Amino acid sequence: MLNEFIYPDKIFWEEKTDTYGRLVVEPLERGFGTTVGNSLRRVLLSSISGTAITAVKIYGIYHEFSAIEGVQEDAIELIANLKKIKFLMKGDSDVEILYLQKKGEGEVKASDIKTPPNVEILNPDQYIATITDPNKELNIEIRVERGRGYVPVEEMEAIGEVGWILVDADFSPVKKVGFRVDNVRVGKKSTYERLTLEIFTNGIKTPDQCMQEAIEILKKHYELLENIFTEKPTVPQKVAVDELAEKLSLSIEELDISQRALNSLKRIGITTIGDLVRMTEDELKSTKNIGRKALAEIKEALHKLGLELGMNIETQR
């Protein structure tokens, strides 16, 4: 006998602050507490977007192992303190350059950093360094980017300008996720489950914002899987060819990629999407300033248009 499948009818935040949330979901069929909890936990820890420092330029030094004249901290210590600053980026910008200029003895804090209107420092009292020389002027440029997950220096895209020090970036606003599964009774049966999910964040995003993003990521993946069972309508050949020609004639500025990736493409003479898809992945990899992250952006943007790198355009017309 086929029993009716039970879906949760109680989903609520048992506790919620800007940095902590405890979500309860019940009832779930046996085994689904772990299935749902584990999938959400993995996505929350690995795939939620955030902001982080990716490069620093400290005027007067050229590598992170330098001492800084007139400053108590060396470059490594100063950069470690900078990485503790929490930046909130609003709007569509993916990259911002911030400036810190401080002269004279005293402590330097995050509040000394000059930020544009779309960037907010959530912990302005974060200590950065102490200037010990009354005549010393500390000048720093800070590159802040949006990203996802943890990106080590080895995977960062090189910055052509001299003086920039690349920094390991932990973009994830989610610091810890845990879940617990308990039995719960529905009617006469006590074999159903209650899922309790705990989320700890750094304050750049709230637990419910992170949860919403995680659900959206999972939802998109399941929708793509569902599409394989949907019969796709046949597109007349002439219409398909005309649509392709229209896409290829578009400017690369129509692509959903970062300004940095866009500038890198323009530097090598690529102005249209047609120019871009003629290039192979290996050709782009060998191009200066197009690293792993930019390449992934480009491939994803082309995929959204039904295109890919290395296309033989002539045979498709």
UniProtKB/Swiss-Prot annotation:
Q: Where is this region: Alpha C-terminal domain (alpha-CTD)?
A: 245-317
What GO cellular-component annotations does this UniProt entry give? cytoplasm; DNA-directed RNA polymerase complex
Keyword annotations from UniProtKB, A to Z: DNA-directed RNA polymerase, Nucleotidyltransferase, Transcription, Transferase
Q: Which GO terms describe its biological process?
A: DNA-templated transcription
The residue range of the signal peptide is none
Task: Quickly give the catalysed reaction.
Answer: RNA(n) + a ribonucleoside 5'-triphosphate = RNA(n+1) + diphosphate
Cross-referenced CDD domains: RNAP_alpha_NTD
A GO molecular function annotation here is:
protein dimerization activity
* Record region (Alpha N-terminal domain (alpha-NTD)): 1-229
Which EC number applies? 2.7.7.6
Q: Domain of life of the organism in this record?
A: Bacteria
Record's function text: DNA-dependent RNA polymerase catalyzes the transcription of DNA into RNA using the four ribonucleoside triphosphates as substrates.
Q: How does it assemble?
A: Homodimer. The RNAP catalytic core consists of 2 alpha, 1 beta, 1 beta' and 1 omega subunit. When a sigma factor is associated with the core the holoenzyme is formed, which can initiate transcription.
Name this polypeptide is given: DNA-directed RNA polymerase subunit alpha
Q: Which organism is it from?
A: Aquifex aeolicus (strain VF5)
